[in-house]
Amino acid sequence: MKNKTPIQSHYDTSSVFVAVIGRPNVGKSSLTNLLVGEKVAIVTSKPQTTRTRITGVITRGPLQYVLLDTPGVHKPHNKLGKRMDKTASDSIADVDVSMMLFEPYGALNESEMVLVEALKKGGPAIAVINKTDLVKDPADLEARKAELKALGVFDDVYTVSVRDNDRCEELFDALSRYAVEGPHYFDDDAYTDMPEKELVAEVIREKALLYMRDEIPHGIAVVVERFKERPGTDLVDIDVNIYCERESHKGMVIGKGGAMLKKIASAARADCEEFLGCRVNLQCWVKVKSDWRDNEFLLNNFGFKQNSSNR
């Protein structure tokens, strides 16, 4: 990540690269969006919503925070899942500090222990207990903190409630202690390095996850084939292919009389117009690519390329 060309030539500034890690659905993307103050990662109630590493950027005066929101580690069932897990584990070696999120209750699962073991070989890390609004007894929270400290991999344990927008300043202060003096790697007004085409694709996938039954959306890939501004207007033409793995799935994505596809596209168009700041002519087509999640060529072609460590 840090092989980017610096955009400033003086060094009265500093930056901190942070890997946001944890099991699926623990709130990594929600926390990233909250800290950034913009929607850089899609959020749904379904696990494995995040598929690739998403970069969120926050610049506060001389200090720039770069958050790498990673896929939740899980037991992979296909090559896409393996790439998702590798993205999360590789990010630990690519940052100044890892920030691992936990639920306030429940035993640590296998995927969390895999990350804990990876942290033992990586750099510094802090633990963050999310969803503290669910805690009824403060003693439960203290017990959870003690449990996480006993793992021996975290410099400290913090708490946050993304739902209540609580204790974010404490997290900023904690992360700033790992900052490295040097240039900012992004423009001060940037909030992500994700191209607009990828943002559009993610928004469409988010709507599919929100509106469709559990299994089908996870077999969907969204590829923006055309993104073109109409000269002299505030209109952008966007053509999108939505790929699924079965002909039967295609019918479900389209819906009766095209109702489901229209619902997905309409909601996505509204979000796209908001973050692009212009009118959007969004055209979506549904196509079938059998078992694309296990096809290396298609994974690369659809944009699911492996992130490489840059340290």
Task: Label every PLM stretch briefly.
Residues 27, 167, 260:
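Conserved glycine(s) of the Walker
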Residues 50, 73-75, 107-108, 135-136, ...:
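Catalytic P-loop NTPase motifs of RecA-like helicase/translocase cores
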Residues 1-97, 102:
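Conserved G1/Walker A P-loop phosphate-binding module
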Residues 124-126, 133-196:
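Canonical P-loop GTPase G-domain recognition
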Residues 196-311:
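P-loop NTP-binding site
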Residues 19, 33, 52, 56, ...:
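Solvent-exposed alpha-helical segments within well-ordered globular domains of core cellular machineries
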Residues 38, 57-61, 76, 91, ...:
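Conserved, well-folded catalytic cores of nucleic-acid-processing
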Residues 59-64, 83-157, 228-232:
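Conserved C-terminal guanine-recognition region of P-loop GTPase G domains, centered on the G4
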